Amino acid sequence: MFSFSEFYKLIAQHETLRPWLNTLPKQLSDWEEAEHGDMGRWIRALKKFPTDKPDIIDIKNEVSVRYEDGIANGEQKRLESLLRLLHPWRKGPYNMHGIHIDTEWRSDWKWDRVLPHISPLQGRSVLDVGCGNGYHMWRMLGEGAALTVGIDPSNLFLIQFEAIRRLMGDDNRAFLLPLGIEQLPELKAFDTVFSMGVLYHRRSPLDHIIQLKNQLRKDGEVILETLVIEGDENAVLVPTGRYAQMHNVYFFPSAKALKVWMEKCGFVDVRIVDESVTTTDEQRSTDWMTNNSLPEYLSPDDPTKTIEGYPAPKRAILVARNPD
């Protein structure tokens, strides 16, 4: 189905990543043998994507590719039809040969909030946990990262990532693996680890924070972004049912409480660098994601609350160092 051989070759050359070869090939082999629903249809579409390298690639300011002389109108329409087969597009935006993929999330806005507060990524190996379709991985490469590895169990995200990677000319500095972080050994290998939009989906948030720490080298940096509430170091919300129509959510600490959690798990120099209310300009339905989105999840009578009556989504970004 997929060949991960290039990734195996790459990590075999890294002393700290090489031990991953003891478990990873079997895990990915098991994944390939499992049933995957729409995967066959998506793979047939994926095989039709061009792989020739575009003349102009911009992953510093956005994620876009184009040829100097443009693309024929018929070829552009064919490419757009292929991309639309991979609906819904949640993370982006992308501009592929003049085709603007207007995704549900303005993930570039999140990146603009994160970037000023982190250590330079130049030459770093980066792990992006819950990476979605890999949008931020391209932006990390745009900042000079040597290698970005994303993990996300969603098959559609994997296919979308591979489609974009093909349109990038098969860039082999970014890899997405269909795994969850609980499937990773304690690698202690990455210079920077990102976890954005994952923590509130975890039944045991402290275990997740420790799992992030176990992937970092000594003095490596973690960037943790998650939904939070207002309050002091003891404030935490545990929704009794759904939150903004999400059913698989568990813990919403205050940013101050999350800082305490990270320190409890052994991180140092923990900083709260941003807190932002998610707006309906940042998350909304589009032509490329036609399902319900944030506007439908907020109370029609009070947009400061979800339709269940909880505080509307607010996100915090924390940055910390692994001293071990």
UniProtKB/Swiss-Prot annotation:
Its EC number(s): 2.5.1.-
Q: List residues binding carboxy-S-adenosyl-L-methionine.
A: 91, 105, 110, 130, 152-154, 181-182, 196, 200, 315
Q: Which CDD domains match?
A: AdoMet_MTases
Q: Does the keyword tRNA processing apply?
A: yes
Please name the SUPFAM superfamilies in this protein's record. S-adenosyl-L-methionine-dependent methyltransferases
Q: Which GO terms describe its biological process?
A: tRNA wobble uridine modification
Superkingdom is Bacteria
Single annotated GO MF: methyltransferase activity
Matching NCBIfam families: PRK15068.1, tRNA 5-methoxyuridine(34)/uridine 5-oxyacetic acid(34) synthase CmoB
Assembly with partners or alone? Homotetramer.
Q: Which family does it belong to?
A: Belongs to the class I-like SAM-binding methyltransferase superfamily. CmoB family.
Q: What is the protein's name according to its record?
A: tRNA U34 carboxymethyltransferase
Organism field: Photobacterium profundum (strain SS9)
Gene name linked to the record: cmoB
